[in-house]
Curated annotation (Swiss-Prot):
The kinase interacting site is required for proper delivery of ERBB2 to the basolateral membrane. The PDZ domain regulates endocytosis and recycling of the receptor at the membrane. Residues 93-175 form the PDZ domain. The gene is Lin7b. It comes from Mus musculus. Expressed in the kidney; predominantly in the vasa recta. The lineage of its organism: Eukaryota, Metazoa, Chordata, Craniata, Vertebrata. Belongs to the lin-7 family. It is found in: Cell membrane; Basolateral cell membrane; Cell junction; Postsynaptic density membrane. This is Protein lin-7 homolog B.
Length: 207
Protein backbone atom coordinates (compact mmCIF):
# COMPACT_ATOMS: atom_id res chain seq x y z
CA UNK A 1 0.00 0.00 0.00
CA UNK A 2 1.46 3.37 -1.02
CA UNK A 3 2.26 5.83 1.74
CA UNK A 4 0.16 8.98 1.95
CA UNK A 5 1.83 11.91 0.24
CA UNK A 6 2.07 15.02 2.39
CA UNK A 7 0.69 17.98 0.43
CA UNK A 8 3.18 20.61 -0.66
CA UNK A 9 3.13 24.20 0.52
CA UNK A 10 5.35 25.75 -2.11
CA UNK A 11 3.30 28.93 -2.42
CA UNK A 12 3.68 29.48 1.33
CA UNK A 13 7.42 28.75 1.11
CA UNK A 14 7.87 31.27 -1.71
CA UNK A 15 6.01 33.90 0.34
CA UNK A 16 8.30 33.26 3.29
CA UNK A 17 11.37 33.57 1.06
CA UNK A 18 10.10 36.93 -0.25
CA UNK A 19 9.54 38.14 3.34
CA UNK A 20 13.08 37.07 4.26
CA UNK A 21 14.50 38.97 1.28
CA UNK A 22 12.60 42.10 2.36
CA UNK A 23 14.09 41.81 5.87
CA UNK A 24 17.59 41.37 4.45
CA UNK A 25 17.10 44.47 2.30
CA UNK A 26 16.09 46.49 5.37
CA UNK A 27 19.06 45.21 7.35
CA UNK A 28 21.54 46.35 4.68
CA UNK A 29 23.68 43.22 5.17
CA UNK A 30 23.67 42.29 1.46
CA UNK A 31 23.71 44.30 -1.81
CA UNK A 32 20.10 45.43 -2.41
CA UNK A 33 20.31 45.02 -6.22
CA UNK A 34 20.88 41.26 -5.99
CA UNK A 35 18.16 40.82 -3.38
CA UNK A 36 15.66 42.79 -5.47
CA UNK A 37 16.52 40.74 -8.57
CA UNK A 38 15.92 37.48 -6.69
CA UNK A 39 12.68 38.83 -5.27
CA UNK A 40 11.45 39.71 -8.77
CA UNK A 41 12.20 36.16 -9.94
CA UNK A 42 10.28 34.61 -7.03
CA UNK A 43 7.27 36.87 -7.69
CA UNK A 44 7.30 36.39 -11.49
CA UNK A 45 4.61 34.59 -13.50
CA UNK A 46 7.28 32.19 -14.74
CA UNK A 47 8.12 31.10 -11.18
CA UNK A 48 4.39 30.65 -10.48
CA UNK A 49 4.05 28.48 -13.61
CA UNK A 50 6.96 26.28 -12.49
CA UNK A 51 5.46 25.93 -9.01
CA UNK A 52 2.01 24.99 -10.34
CA UNK A 53 3.37 22.35 -12.72
CA UNK A 54 5.68 20.94 -10.02
CA UNK A 55 2.82 20.65 -7.51
CA UNK A 56 0.54 19.02 -10.11
CA UNK A 57 3.20 16.42 -10.99
CA UNK A 58 4.13 15.83 -7.34
CA UNK A 59 0.50 15.05 -6.47
CA UNK A 60 -0.13 12.74 -9.42
CA UNK A 61 3.11 10.90 -10.29
CA UNK A 62 2.97 7.21 -9.34
CA UNK A 63 6.29 6.98 -7.46
CA UNK A 64 7.18 4.91 -4.42
CA UNK A 65 10.06 5.79 -2.14
CA UNK A 66 11.16 8.52 0.23
CA UNK A 67 10.11 12.16 -0.01
CA UNK A 68 13.56 12.92 -1.41
CA UNK A 69 13.14 10.33 -4.21
CA UNK A 70 9.69 11.69 -5.04
CA UNK A 71 10.94 15.29 -5.06
CA UNK A 72 13.86 14.37 -7.34
CA UNK A 73 11.59 12.54 -9.81
CA UNK A 74 9.10 15.43 -9.79
CA UNK A 75 11.88 17.94 -10.44
CA UNK A 76 13.06 15.91 -13.45
CA UNK A 77 9.51 15.66 -14.82
CA UNK A 78 9.00 19.42 -14.36
CA UNK A 79 12.23 20.22 -16.20
CA UNK A 80 11.17 17.85 -19.00
CA UNK A 81 7.79 19.60 -19.31
CA UNK A 82 9.39 23.02 -19.64
CA UNK A 83 12.11 21.77 -21.98
CA UNK A 84 9.44 20.32 -24.27
CA UNK A 85 7.79 23.74 -24.39
CA UNK A 86 10.96 25.61 -25.39
CA UNK A 87 10.12 28.17 -28.04
CA UNK A 88 6.45 28.07 -27.04
CA UNK A 89 4.43 29.40 -24.13
CA UNK A 90 5.25 27.75 -20.82
CA UNK A 91 2.98 25.02 -19.41
CA UNK A 92 0.03 26.05 -17.25
CA UNK A 93 -2.19 24.08 -14.89
CA UNK A 94 -5.95 24.51 -15.38
CA UNK A 95 -8.36 22.84 -12.95
CA UNK A 96 -12.03 22.48 -13.88
CA UNK A 97 -14.96 20.96 -11.95
CA UNK A 98 -16.48 17.83 -13.48
CA UNK A 99 -20.25 18.25 -13.66
CA UNK A 100 -23.18 16.69 -15.51
CA UNK A 101 -22.98 19.42 -18.15
CA UNK A 102 -19.50 18.32 -19.21
CA UNK A 103 -16.27 20.31 -19.28
CA UNK A 104 -17.27 22.77 -21.97
CA UNK A 105 -14.54 22.34 -24.55
CA UNK A 106 -13.70 20.27 -27.64
CA UNK A 107 -10.40 18.65 -28.57
CA UNK A 108 -8.93 17.62 -31.90
CA UNK A 109 -5.79 15.86 -33.12
CA UNK A 110 -3.94 12.81 -31.82
CA UNK A 111 -1.38 10.21 -32.81
CA UNK A 112 -3.60 8.75 -35.53
CA UNK A 113 -3.64 12.18 -37.19
CA UNK A 114 0.08 12.70 -36.65
CA UNK A 115 -0.55 15.79 -34.55
CA UNK A 116 -0.66 16.91 -30.90
CA UNK A 117 -4.00 17.06 -29.10
CA UNK A 118 -5.43 20.57 -28.98
CA UNK A 119 -8.29 22.52 -27.48
CA UNK A 120 -10.13 23.37 -30.69
CA UNK A 121 -13.11 25.12 -29.10
CA UNK A 122 -14.13 26.54 -25.72
CA UNK A 123 -17.94 26.44 -25.66
CA UNK A 124 -19.42 29.87 -24.79
CA UNK A 125 -21.10 29.76 -21.37
CA UNK A 126 -19.75 26.27 -20.62
CA UNK A 127 -17.71 25.17 -17.60
CA UNK A 128 -14.32 25.97 -19.14
CA UNK A 129 -15.53 29.36 -20.36
CA UNK A 130 -16.98 30.32 -16.97
CA UNK A 131 -13.89 29.29 -15.00
CA UNK A 132 -11.41 30.78 -17.47
CA UNK A 133 -7.82 29.66 -17.89
CA UNK A 134 -8.37 27.45 -20.93
CA UNK A 135 -8.02 28.84 -24.46
CA UNK A 136 -8.59 27.67 -28.00
CA UNK A 137 -5.10 26.83 -29.24
CA UNK A 138 -3.94 25.27 -25.96
CA UNK A 139 -2.06 22.02 -26.50
CA UNK A 140 -3.15 19.34 -24.03
CA UNK A 141 -0.08 17.87 -22.30
CA UNK A 142 -1.62 15.82 -19.48
CA UNK A 143 -4.92 14.96 -17.82
CA UNK A 144 -4.83 14.38 -14.05
CA UNK A 145 -1.10 13.64 -14.22
CA UNK A 146 -1.31 11.22 -17.17
CA UNK A 147 0.60 12.43 -20.23
CA UNK A 148 -1.30 12.55 -23.52
CA UNK A 149 1.65 13.71 -25.63
CA UNK A 150 1.99 11.33 -28.56
CA UNK A 151 -1.24 9.52 -27.58
CA UNK A 152 -4.31 8.71 -29.64
CA UNK A 153 -7.31 11.06 -29.54
CA UNK A 154 -9.45 8.42 -27.83
CA UNK A 155 -6.96 8.11 -24.93
CA UNK A 156 -7.44 11.79 -24.05
CA UNK A 157 -11.23 11.46 -24.37
CA UNK A 158 -11.23 8.43 -22.02
CA UNK A 159 -9.12 10.25 -19.40
CA UNK A 160 -11.41 13.29 -19.50
CA UNK A 161 -14.53 11.11 -19.18
CA UNK A 162 -13.03 9.07 -16.32
CA UNK A 163 -12.18 12.12 -14.19
CA UNK A 164 -14.21 12.37 -10.98
CA UNK A 165 -15.04 15.58 -9.14
CA UNK A 166 -12.55 17.74 -11.00
CA UNK A 167 -9.94 17.49 -13.73
CA UNK A 168 -6.44 18.99 -13.75
CA UNK A 169 -5.07 19.79 -17.17
CA UNK A 170 -1.51 20.78 -18.04
CA UNK A 171 -1.61 22.84 -21.24
CA UNK A 172 0.54 25.26 -23.22
CA UNK A 173 -0.65 27.91 -25.64
CA UNK A 174 0.56 27.30 -29.22
CA UNK A 175 -2.21 28.64 -31.49
CA UNK A 176 -0.06 28.76 -34.63
CA UNK A 177 0.40 24.99 -34.60
CA UNK A 178 -3.38 24.51 -34.22
CA UNK A 179 -4.01 26.82 -37.18
CA UNK A 180 -1.53 24.84 -39.30
CA UNK A 181 -3.18 21.58 -38.25
CA UNK A 182 -6.69 22.88 -39.08
CA UNK A 183 -5.46 24.13 -42.47
CA UNK A 184 -4.01 20.68 -43.19
CA UNK A 185 -7.28 18.96 -42.24
CA UNK A 186 -9.24 21.40 -44.43
CA UNK A 187 -7.00 20.58 -47.40
CA UNK A 188 -7.63 16.87 -46.81
CA UNK A 189 -11.41 17.44 -46.64
CA UNK A 190 -11.32 19.53 -49.82
CA UNK A 191 -9.36 16.83 -51.63
CA UNK A 192 -11.90 14.20 -50.55
CA UNK A 193 -14.80 16.39 -51.72
CA UNK A 194 -13.14 16.91 -55.11
CA UNK A 195 -12.54 13.17 -55.42
CA UNK A 196 -16.17 12.38 -54.53
CA UNK A 197 -17.42 15.00 -57.00
CA UNK A 198 -15.18 13.56 -59.72
CA UNK A 199 -16.48 10.03 -59.04
CA UNK A 200 -20.10 11.23 -59.14
CA UNK A 201 -19.52 13.10 -62.41
CA UNK A 202 -17.86 10.04 -63.96
CA UNK A 203 -20.84 7.85 -63.04
CA UNK A 204 -23.26 10.38 -64.56
CA UNK A 205 -21.32 10.52 -67.83
CA UNK A 206 -21.39 6.73 -68.06
CA UNK A 207 -25.14 6.71 -67.59
Amino acid sequence: MAALVEPLGLERDVSRAVELLERLQRSGELPPQKLQALQRVLQSRFCSAIREVYEQLYDTLDITGSAEVRAHATAKATVAAFTASEGHAHPRVVELPKTDEGLGFNIMGGKEQNSPIYISRVIPGGVADRHGGLKRGDQLLSVNGVSVEGEHHEKAVELLKAAQGSVKLVVRYTPRVLEEMEARFEKMRSARRRQQHHSYTSLESRG
